[in-house]
Amino acid sequence: MKITVRLLCLRLLLAVCNVSGADDVNKPANTTILMVDDHHILYRSGTVRKLKPLKRFSDKPVIAADKLWETTVAYCSVYKNPESGKYQLWYQAWPGRSGCYMCYAESDDGINWIKPELGLLTFNGSSKNNILFKNGYGASVIFDKNDPDPDKRYKSAFWEQDLIKGLKYPGMSIAYSPDGIHWEKHPKNPLIKGSYGDYIQPPLANDLKQQGAQGKPVSVSDVIDLIWDQNRQVYAVYAKTWLDGPKGDMHWKRAVVRTESKNFIDWTKPRLIIWPDEFDSINDLAETDRTAGGGGSDGVQLHSGPAFYYNDLYFSMLQVMDSGGTGNMPIELALSRDGYSWKR
């Protein structure tokens, strides 16, 4: 009788698992199951999920804007080179109105950084600087161990709008490097036209000559995060985009799109994946006064969504921009099982 009852209970448990769509609860013994959401959990009554906030290392930045070409610094990528043991870091430096630069630093411990004098580019008559190339706005870098071409071991995706080189449209561009220092840009850049059609960033809503190109279709904009998606076996970019408002207001809200590529050259149409919702003051009126040098509207927006894949889950450190409130950009955790459908 006891055996019969046990078999009945086992069959009922298997039936519940199948009905709930939780077949993947049965993972191999050597697989780590993450409990950051309820995907693998059938029942958890009486439990509380607590996420431990990240702790900032110190009050001082580890990469300070302390060079002549560094009025501000932003948008970095980090990689630990297994051969040298050094951390490599690529970041954007903004000297002012003369455009931006992609710069390089390295470290033995990830805390104390050196900006080597590379001698690759001249700034104010001197090549004693750590500048890699010009106009790599929002550049993101990955190390690609699978590419058979050693000259393309490092890959970068970035926003470029170089009038000097005669680019017709700003947009997402790419570059290759054998060592992370010496870079070659793709001759057909930009590979994806940006989400607005001219070099003004962004144009005013009353600029009639621009209205045909605003966010239609949704495309990439000037914040780009590149990853190798090991789950889907593709290169993927999570980028900022601009959404038009419900009343036709241009550049109403910032949101996040994803595009991917098998060969790093041919990219899919950017797809909108994360956008402001009813909890983000989405009904705020558009702000068209951009005299301060930046675009956007009041209220909460999603400035960018850098992501990575770990075990069977995508994580995004979503940058939430509150331009009309505190002016801060807090980080929110977002989760996805496929890289496209996200929960915040």
Q: What are these language model-derived features?
A:
Residues 1-6:
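Positively charged n-region of N-terminal signal peptides that target proteins for export
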Residues 7-16:
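Bacterial N-terminal signal peptides
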Residues 18-21:
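Sec/Tat signal peptide C-region and signal peptidase I cleavage site
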Residues 23-299, 308-344:
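Beta-rich carbohydrate-recognition and catalytic domains
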Residues 304:
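Structured ligand/cofactor/substrate-binding pocket environments in proteins
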